[in-house]
Each structure stands twice: as C-alpha cells, then as structure tokens.
Amino acid sequence: NMSGNLVTSIQSSLVLAYGVRKEIKSGDAEAWKIQSEIMPISGASLDPQGEINTEWELKLNDDCPITDKSASLFLLFGGDKVMEEGGRIDLRVELHPILQSFLQTFTTQFKFLEKHRKSKEDHTEVKLVPPESKEFPNLEQILCMLKIHEEQLESVFQFKMKGFSRDGENMKVVKKKREFEIQMTPEEYLLPGDFPNRQLFREKISEALDIARQRVF
C-alpha cells in the first residue's frame, strides 16, 4: 500500500485460463476457458506503506492444452474484474514429458519429421511425415492425437495413404485413410524411477506402422 491511508476489503484473484489469441483481444470475459482459479487474498486490510505476502499454487492437469501459435494457457491476476481488466501472463506450456518421449520415438527410431503441433479440444495433434525410404512407400502423413487422461496414455494415429488396389484383373491408384489406436497404463509406460518405457514405445509404434508397410490395400 503506497498510499497514506488504510485500504480495506482487498481481494486478489488468480485464474488459470485458456485463450485463443485473436479472441481475447476483445477483452470479453467469455473468450476465456477457465481451467482453475483461487483467491489467495480475500477481505484483507492493508495499513499505509504495508504489504501482504501469501503463498499459492495452481497445478496443471496432465491433459492441459499446450501452447501453440494460436492459443495458450494464461495466468490472469487482479481484483473483482480479473477476467476483463486483470493482468495476464502468457504461460509456455510444453507437451507432457511422457508424451514427448513417446513422440520422439517417431523422429529418432523411425526417422519421421514433425511438421506441426497443435492443441485441440481434448488432445494435442501432431503431424508427421515419413522418411524417404522404401519402408513406407504408400504413406503420405500421419496425424497423431496424443493425451494423458486419468493417467492413461492415449494415442490415435490417422494414416493418410496412397497405393494400388485390385479391381478385378486390373490395379488402380487409390487414396485411403486408416486409423490405429494405442492405450497404455502407467504400469506399462513407466519403468521404475518413473522413466519412460522407450522399448515399449518402439514396439507399439512399430505395430501401428505395420499399416503403412502394406503395399496393396
């Protein structure tokens, strides 16, 4: 309190909220999707030249949205109108470490190239393109939907493929989409010491990639 007067009924709010950058510019509170909120200080009084210190904690969920070019999690802080007039901190949220390790298996073991990473409604979408090799002649790209929900690792692969299909005695070029789903429990994807089970990741991903290794479909 930098003034010479007593200040009463002090309220401090902290809100963890998700916002699309072009939408939150309007200042409309409805543009935010609240994840969690706390009120570290409520109804306090502050003497002239005094200050209040308080501890607080906001935890991110395992399946919280990551930061990308269009949207992010923000920490909003202020008083009664924190959503409209409060300050904000743009949080740089990365992919969950276990999901990051799972994803790295594509790039390190199978030489896929990551093209983009986006936060969707309840998962992270990653676009992967295959290496130039004879192993995946029909594969154009993979959309990988990743999340950890209630401690379970869930991944859905959407394969975009092209190849040859039999039409009687003839062969024709066709394009198709295939899907493969992987689910793992913490007992499966974690080793003692909470290290990621990279060997299992390789096995699961290799099983999924068998779809793309088929030359005729």
Tell me what each language-model feature is.
Residues 1-2, 14-20, 60-62, 77-81, ...:
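Beta-strand elements of well-folded, non-transmembrane domains
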Residues 2-58, 186, 200:
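A surface-exposed loop-and-adjacent beta-strand signature within N-terminal beta-sandwich domains
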Residues 38-43, 85-90, 179-181:
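Well-ordered beta-strand positions in beta-sheet-rich domains
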Residues 51-55, 86-88, 141:
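Intrinsic-disorder/low-complexity, polar/charged segments enriched in Ser/Thr/Lys/Arg/Asp/Glu/Gln
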Residues 62-74:
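Short glycine/proline/serine/threonine-rich loop/turn segments at secondary-structure transition edges
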Residues 82-105:
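Short beta-strand elements
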Residues 103-123:
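Localized sequence-composition bias
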Residues 117-216:
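C-terminal interaction module
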